[in-house]
Amino acid sequence: QRQMCIRDSNYPTADAVFAGEMDRQRALEAAGDTNLDELCEPTAKMTAAMLSLLSEEPGERRVLERLGYLLGRYIYMADALDDWEKDKKHGDFNPFLQCEDEPEALKRHARASLLLTIGEMGAALDLLELRHFGPILENIIRLGLPQTVEELQLPPKQRRKREK
């Protein structure tokens, strides 16, 4: 599957990162790892590698890499929180199922971690000179992502319906 466009492009380094991190993600989940930071890391590293390719300038590239890392962390956690009840029902791996917290405490902890990650994304975004789509990126990071976190606090049936 990863052989799609990135493999056919001029980005062999990103391809190697993706392959290694996808293998690492599978291994962590198969082992039943409970460390949320470790579990977020492969997705974070993949998005960091992807965003770092958007600039040739070293300083900007480093900021984009950090933004990508944080975005990947957000994606992994938000997806896990979104799938928590379904994964519990089907016996699938979910990092939040590894916690012994009650569901409401778990949601509060996840919310705090997600909002902290979003705050760091905003700080990284502030370091970039946005040439294109600045207002759109600002809206997504500062409004859209926090709204999604709040929506994930609701039971699945009360969440806004999204097309899959």
Which role fits each region the language model picked out?
Residues N10, D15-F18, M22, D33-A48, ...:
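Catalytic cores of Mg2+-dependent Asp-rich isoprenoid enzymes
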Residues R2-I6:
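Short, small-residue-biased leader/transition segments that mark boundaries at the very start
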